[in-house]
Amino acid sequence: MALDFLAGCAGGVAGVIVGHPFDTVKVRLQVQNTEKPQYRGTLHCFQSIIKQESVLGLYKGLGSPLMGLTFINALVFGVQGNTLRALGQDSPLNQFLAGAAAGAIQCVICCPMELAKTRLQLQAAGPARAYKGSLDCLVQIYRHEGLRGINRGMVSTLLRETPSFGVYFLTYDVLTRAMGCEPGDRLLVPKLLLAGGTSGITSWLSTYPMDVVKSRLQADGLQGTPRYRGIVDCMRQSYQAEGWQVFTRGLASTLLRAFPVNAATFATVTVVLTYIRGEEDQVDSEAAPGASTTPAGPALAQPSSL
């Protein structure tokens, strides 16, 4: 189990590095003023950030997700695996329930982390910056708003993450079974990448409107008096002012991000598991009495261990 946590964390780091620029663009598109929009679309937003803030502008708020990454991956993989074993049967329904449980519990870390990330991503470049970094952002929020401020957007995060992780693990399970992912398959890694990337896209599509609401609630009040009284009020005001399209704002950059992020994540997880398990097998074979002198090759990871 500890090995799964380690591999998952390594994969998560790779995924964050690949996907964070897309996330920055997504957040800015979601919360920009519709009456005087600063960006015309995903590509224009990318170009504007790079031109005005350099490439580093795309990585604003990176420290926050990296800080919480170890704990989030440990929770997700640990809770999902233990819940699945507790349910007793590896079925599609149980995969969904186990994933949903993992998604709900990791919100304890995910919500404050995304709050800091969102506020840093919206922060303008220059000497007048309100926050020096992720930790400083959270400290200042706590000083001014208390524990409630740190957990701003928790309910909307729960409503997004719980079904999203359920859909993710369900889709991944169905795809790996359908593609016949088995140890020793020469195409195992590409299959895992395809399954992971597709699962990421599917999970985002399933709960994206709630992600828009979550981003708006977490950014609310930065420019003065808060506009929204809660989730329902945010949805109502957003719909009345901008129509149903508001709930798809930033979707293009999110889907562009979803596949490569999950591809990077699962590629890294596979490499880490394959290497470490290969080393362990070799050590075990050398330590065992009468063991063969031919070292065993590293076995590719079982899909269920990811």
Curated annotation (Swiss-Prot):
Q: Name one GO cellular component term.
A: mitochondrion
Reactions catalysed: L-lysine(out) + L-arginine(in) = L-lysine(in) + L-arginine(out); L-histidine(out) + L-arginine(in) = L-histidine(in) + L-arginine(out); L-ornithine(in) + L-arginine(out) = L-ornithine(out) + L-arginine(in); L-homoarginine(in) + L-arginine(out) = L-homoarginine(out) + L-arginine(in)
Q: Which InterPro entries match?
A: Mit_carrier, Mitochondrial_Carrier, Mitochondrial_sb/sol_carrier, Mt_carrier_dom_sf
Keywords, A to Z, come to: Amino-acid transport, Membrane, Mitochondrion, Mitochondrion inner membrane, Repeat, Transmembrane, Transmembrane helix, Transport
Q: Where are the transmembrane segments?
A: 2-22, 61-81, 96-116, 153-172, 187-207, 255-275
Q: Which domain of life is it from?
A: Eukaryota
SUPFAM superfamilies (UniProt xref): Mitochondrial carrier
Q: What subcellular locations does the record give?
A: Mitochondrion inner membrane
Q: Where are the Solcar repeats?
A: 2-86, 90-178, 190-275
Major place of localization?
Answer: mitochondrion
Where in the sequence does UniProt note compositional bias of the Low complexity kind?
287-306
Q: Which Pfam families match?
A: Mito_carr
**Which residue intervals make up region (Disordered)?**
283-306
Q: What topology does it adopt in the membrane? A: Multi-pass membrane protein
Q: What is one process in the GO biological process aspect for this record?
A: L-lysine transmembrane transport
For the keyword Transmembrane helix, the answer is yes
Gene Ontology MF annotations: basic amino acid transmembrane transporter activity; high-affinity L-arginine transmembrane transporter activity; high-affinity lysine transmembrane transporter activity; O-acyl-L-carnitine transmembrane transporter activity
Q: Which family does it belong to?
A: Belongs to the mitochondrial carrier (TC 2.A.29) family.
What is known about what this protein does? Answer: Mitochondrial transporter of arginine, lysine, homoarginine, methylarginine and, to a much lesser extent, ornithine and histidine. Does not transport carnitine nor acylcarnitines. Functions by both counter-exchange and uniport mechanisms. Plays a physiological role in the import of basic amino acids into mitochondria for mitochondrial protein synthesis and amino acid degradation.
Q: What is this protein called?
A: Mitochondrial basic amino acids transporter
